[in-house]
Amino acid sequence: MSCFKQDVYNCITPKTLSFVKSFLKQRSNDPAASTHLSSARVVEWNLNGIEVDSRARDELKAAVNILFRIMKYIGQFPFPKLSSKDDSEIISLTVQEFVIASVFISGRYRKLFGNDNGEIIWKFLFIALSHQSDMNFFEDDLDHLFTIPLKYPIEDGDSIAIKAQKVDWGGLEIIKKLSNLDMNQLQLQPSLFLNLTTLFLLTESIPNQKHNKMHDQFVHNLTTWKDFRKYSLDLLRYMNNDLSKDDLNSQTLSWSEFSLGMNNLLAPFVEVNLRKVVENNVLNISLPFFETSANSKMDGTGDEVPNGATTGTKTTMKENEGAGVEAQSKEETKVGNDVESSFGSKLVSISLIAYISSMLRGIGSTIEVTRFNAIKLFAGLEAGFSIRSLENKIYKWHAPTLLFVSGKRIKQRTIDTNRRYQEFDETYPKFFQANEDLLKSWQYTNDRITYCVLINQPWQNSNKKNFGDEKSLILSLEPRADYYTSLHSEILKGQLIYFNNSGMGLGFGNAQPLNKSNNKKYYPGDVSLTIESNLEFAVFRHLGSLSTNATTYFNRSRLPSTVAHEDFEDRFLITDLEVWGIGSKKELEEQQRQWKWEEQQAEARQSVNIRNMGEERAFLEMAGLVGNNGSGGSL
């Protein structure tokens, strides 16, 4: 079938017309009722009256501009055309472009093209971020006739919606061109992608709820943009672990690195949060779409202002009755008490929880972690770095836990002078030769190293036998994202954890350590994390080039780069160690009631001891064992 560009666009939109109507709160089917939306307007809408540091403000602007660049490129499907290469240029979307982009972002395009073309949106995203001005597949000619393939013949009486169902969307020329395109000729700019993933990670921290609450929490979390940015860079290092924060503008990501990174970990994170930003309207993207009428106003930027809103006043979409836009005062948009700024932890934050949540989703874990179902059980900085203290705090929790361990890479001075480290090193088997360089190209002496272990089963005293199941996994959080899942084995059955309170510490992916008289020795697995008994030093080991005699409990890295086949260790001095319980609201309430009861019992016992002290002292004085002056008696 031959038709013009606009006819093709018209065939796409009926498939999602009802969705778009409800989302945009359109009050008319008249195309003249809406106009364009600029990226600058969206940023202004969200930052109005909000105190955010200048760098965060600039990077949010860049992220929204990049988002609009991607949406504009996708929104011109099936005749995509890249806009200007200038990142600072304000990008505007028409309603038609917004609608078509939403078809892809919402995932509804799969109904049109089939699941075989699921990678198409990642190609569009990569091309849009690659800044290749020559990647326009079609002439910009509205009068040119295009041929579109059909599944079924078009009849004269068919409506546009019926015609859309008869089009073979998967057979479009653009799909063929994308399939044959050598994507490796393109290079993605990680500095652009970093701003976008920071926006997505911030969105990840916001649970699905009413729109006004989601937007309030988004605005609140903007104040910690730099924390989200730090973890976003760690996520991007999953694609290329050589990315440096100081030199991002001169670095690139290849299509191979990008596609493997997306497929192995990041695709669910990007897909879910891209949809949340646009479809759930966290950024209020659709609000500045407005009716063109005599009652509309103009603000100082040259954009029109929706009816009912005043210039310089923040607005949010009304949740019920679909009544469009309603003005709210700054007091009404302040974040409520339910928005927590921190967890009372030096290590764990809202941004870190969002980071872990995104990784667990990408791995396919059934365990969900949010700021609402996590409770701190142990913190070394509060309770002391003691194996007994750790044991007392975590053994009463009967749901999954997350163990965080963080510190600084061991330096040569510690190796040469710290006797406690030397004793630990003597009991931990060496793999590398003394003359080998222990640091790989992506490892630096000043690295902050952070690992997180997901323990699905309750903690057990395991001085003789390991415990655990195959849902256990190790997450590398800093300086780069990576993950190590439990190896499926009918023999091991995921029993890969020990908690040894008799002098050998904690092991994840290790065999039981030897601890007899003066003979102590660790047996680390090829992929393992070992924490010595004083909770002072830790070692993560990854042997990827060859198999050793050690039992393998965890799978090796699936990093797209050469890391999967590398032998390396992260040895670090522990500065923070925390354990957090993950459970339902019911489990949290039951655990809190149990802790409260135990505190009351402890206070009662202390009270009894104080009351009985007088009687006990009297007997001791009568026996002459304690003098009246309280300094002891004489015989």
From Swiss-Prot:
TLDc domain spans which residues?
346-583
Q: Where is this region: Disordered?
A: 297-333
Q: Which residues form the signal peptide?
A: none
Indicate what this protein is called per its UniProt record: Restriction of telomere capping protein 5
Q: Cellular location of this protein?
A: Cytoplasm
Q: Which InterPro entries does this chain map to?
A: TLDc_dom (IPR006571)
* Role of this protein: May be involved in a process influencing telomere capping.
Which species does this protein come from? Answer: Lodderomyces elongisporus (strain ATCC 11503 / CBS 2605 / JCM 1781 / NBRC 1676 / NRRL YB-4239) (Yeast)
Q: Which PROSITE patterns match?
A: TLDC
Tell whether Glycoprotein is among the UniProt keywords: no
Q: Which UniProt keywords apply?
A: Cytoplasm
Q: What is its main location?
A: cytoplasm
Name one cellular component (GO) term.
cytoplasm
Recorded family membership: Belongs to the RTC5 family.
Q: Which SMART domains match?
A: TLDc (SM00584)
